Amino acid sequence: ALPVVDKDGKYLSLLHYSGFAKGVLTILNPEKRHAISTNIDLIQKTLNAQPIIVSNDSDKNFNATILVGSSSDETFIKRLESHASEDIVVIASDREQIHKICIEHKVKLMITTSGCVISKELRELAEQNGVSVIVSPYPTSPTSMLIAYSMPVSVMGDKEIQTVSMNDTVNKIQKILKDAYCKYLPVVDEENRVIGIVSEH
């Protein structure tokens, strides 16, 4: 388990394996629609992607609706239109028509896969429409899986975990640990700065 802190070292949440695994598995569940909180910079770093066009707000978090451009053009357009009010991230392979559709519909981010670079004409259109474009070195399937790991730890951290004070007794902490589903508790000082972690083991 790892405590998540702000820039002053003050406690925000606890990142633990069960919570992390649950979060990632929920996102990867194909039966459900999910938006993930991330930003373009984090996606680019996670994928080790090449930036082609990146917006000025690339470090700003947003709730990304992830779509894969693998269906027919008509079906894909319908899917885009059904998510029109959302911040859409599209994972596309080397299909130029899908690239054009994404740019014309002004998606937030288009990720081409397997090192595919878009044409000069589409690059100019993407700049005009404010569409960010990055190139993933991976095929479509691994790219789709890896995006889930671009979420910042501030999103994955468990905010329900109770903190304990550096002056709390072992007796008090034992009772808290016994009832807690996560067997780690962050230890904080008077200013809520993390000074350690206590565990049941």
Model-derived features: positions:
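Short hydrophobic alpha-helical runs that function as membrane-insertion/retention elements
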Residues: 2-3, 89-92, 108-116, 124, ...
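Short loop/turn microsegments at loop-to-beta-strand junctions
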Residues: 182-183
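Bateman/CBS regulatory modules and CBS-like beta-alpha motifs in cytosolic regions of diverse proteins
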Residues: 1-6, 11, 41-52, 63-77, ...
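Internal alpha/beta core interface subdomains
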Residues: 20-28, 105, 116-120
